[in-house]
Amino acid sequence: MAKQTTMKNAALKQLTKDADEILHLIKVQLDNLTLPSCPLYEEVLDTQMFGLQKEVDFAVKLGLVDREDGKQIMLRLEKELSKLHEAFTLV
């Protein structure tokens, strides 16, 4: 049981880390390369979000992450990206 809890914690930690890396990638992209209206920005964002959602789905299927925890990771990232997008479009 302890090993399963450790695996679940590791999975949640990794998914959260991946979400944070996506947020960082998008911040760097906006700071240095593109505007939120650029198709390249949208493509990178869509690809990264799709990949993270697949990671979450896989972890849920393996029983490493509760579906609700996975949704919360995605929701938190979407909210942060929305704030970031607003900040760059208001400038």
From Swiss-Prot:
Gene3D superfamilies: SO2669-like (1.10.287.750)
Domain of life: Bacteria
Disulfide bridge map: none
Pfam short name (any one): DUF1507
SUPFAM superfamilies named among the record's database cross-references: EF2458-like (SSF140404)
Family: Belongs to the UPF0358 family.
Protein known as: UPF0358 protein SAB0977
Species per Swiss-Prot/TrEMBL record: Staphylococcus aureus (strain bovine RF122 / ET3-1)
